[in-house]
Amino acid sequence: LGVFLDGYNKERVDCEKLIMTSSNYITASSNFEQNLISESYQIDKNKIKKITPGIDRSLFAPDLSANRKNIFLSIGRIQQQKGQRVTIDFLNNFRKVENDFVCYFIGGPSGNSGKEYLVELKEQVVELNLETHVKFLENLPQTKIKELLNESKLLIHTSQFETFGLVAIEANSMGVPVLSTNSGSFPEMIFSGVNGYLADNLV
């Protein structure tokens, strides 16, 4: 939704509101998004129908013979909304109890300040002496992401705002639990101790 984009775009928000108020029906990917649309744009909730996104299970199917390593993944566009800074802080704390791990950040910079944010993240890694534990891979094809999911033990997703975290469903489909914050749509799809872990704060 435009009202939550990095670098608030009034023109986009106005267009979204015009489209939504003029439409007979609106689709939302989660209960969270359904409520958000209704409250943010003053839309009758009865007009909003929830249709949960699916995934290609022929692609995101686990290799049961794969040898999983101490690899963590953070997959998503590099922008402040996605909360990668929190992930790095979490990794810095985690290192105090376990030093044998590496976390790959997959995704390119996005939004008005994405490139600047990526530079800040890399500086944060250096300041915390996490160079051997954190690697930035930027954009990768789905086939390569699947390979990494087969090798990984955890997906970390610390987005500040997520109407539907498709990457979490993809990871679960590959047998990878998800560590995330108790916000947005994640309480609808992640159940602590079952397919992942939720926390109010990770640091």
Place the predicted regions along the sequence by residue.
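Short hydrophobic beta-strand element within catalytic cores of glycosyltransferases
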Residues: 168, 177-180
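Carbohydrate-associated surface elements
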Residues: 32, 54
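Conserved donor-binding/catalytic core segment of Leloir-type glycosyltransferases
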Residues: 27, 64-82, 88-91, 103-106
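A conserved nucleotide-sugar
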Residues: 84, 88-135, 143
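Short alpha-helical donor nucleotide-sugar binding micro-motif in glycosyltransferases
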Residues: 139, 147-152
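Membrane-proximal helix-turn-helix segments that form the acceptor-binding/catalytic region
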Residues: 7-26
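Aromatic "clamp/platform" in nucleotide-sugar-dependent glycosyltransferases that forms part
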Residues: 160
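Conserved acidic donor-binding segment of nucleotide-sugar-dependent glycosyltransferases
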Residues: 192-193, 197-203
